Design a protein with these regions (language model features):
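ABC ATPase nucleotide-binding domains
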Residues: 225-238
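H-loop (His-switch) and adjacent beta-strand-loop-beta switch element
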Residues: 210-223
């Protein structure tokens, strides 16, 4: 599904430059659930931004579904992202002046979808994420966990082939975090490819593969045993 070849990213710092990604070579297969881990400043979020087409200042090759994304214009990359990628941010990124229903509908409003069909899709998402009662509220009226559920609903409503999540449970208490990770597992079992950035070993245990970054370099790539049950209490409390 995805292949990165010698992808690098740097920022100018005075007369020199600071590298945040160094010679990244990575393949991601359809249906994988990948966790990206590493210390602060390792390049985790930078990698996610490249995968999401939010950053186009990198060097190297990015193949997405056999398309050479690195050879496309910015407008064409944005179109590729709209059709294929959903993004969940740690800070939610909901629009304050839109209701829950309107926030979830936003990705659909960019597509040529009849209004009646959009309304049905939004209603299904509200029901799926158990936030029907919150549909007319604004983000400021929601708890952190509720806002994150809205963010996830918005990210997946157009059935993206790829779901990217940057510390999606970082500000949540354990029960909310567990609920969101169970939703991720369900989405993955239904065929969605997921790449999450996290510091949490508990969250990492939900994935099928863990990638380690350090100082911009990919230093580890290991498969995770697929759990038949939810992570143990011992793992949750680590």
């Amino acid at each position: 599904m995805i292949q990165l070849k010698n992808v690098e990213r740097s920022y100018k710092t005075g007369p020199g430059q600071t590298w945040v990604l160094r010679r990244i070579n990575l393949e991601i297969q359809q249906g994988e659930f990948i966790t990206v881990m590493g210390p602060s400043g390792a390049g985790k979020s930078s990698l996610l931004n490249v995968l999401a087409f939010l950053d186009d200042q990198w060097q190297g090759e990015y193949w997405f579904r056999e398309q050479a994304a690195h050879a496309k214009k910015r407008k064409d990359r944005a179109e590729l992202a709209k059709k294929n990628v959903g993004m969940v941010f740690q800070s939610y990124h909901l629009l304050d002046d839109l209701t829950v229903m309107e926030n979830i509908d936003l990705p659909l409003s960019y597509k040529d979808i009849p209004r009646s069909q959009r309304q049905t899709l939004v209603a299904d998402a509200l029901d799926r994420f158990q936030i029907v009662a919150k549909k007319d509220l604004y983000p400021s009226q929601l708890s952190g966990g509720q806002q994150q559920l809205v963010g996830i609903a918005r990210a997946v409503i157009h059935n993206p082939a790829l779901l990217l999540a940057d510390e999606p449970t970082g500000n949540l208490h354990s029960s909310q975090a567990k609920e969101i990770m169970e939703l991720f597992r369900e989405l993955n079992q239904q065929g969605t490819t997921i790449v999450q950035v996290t510091h949490s070993e508990t969250n990492a245990a939900y994935g099928t593969r863990t990638i380690q970054l350090r100082d911009g370099w990919l230093v580890g790539d290991t498969g995770n045993p697929r759990p038949t049950t939810e992570p143990s209490d011992a793992a949750v409390n680590r």
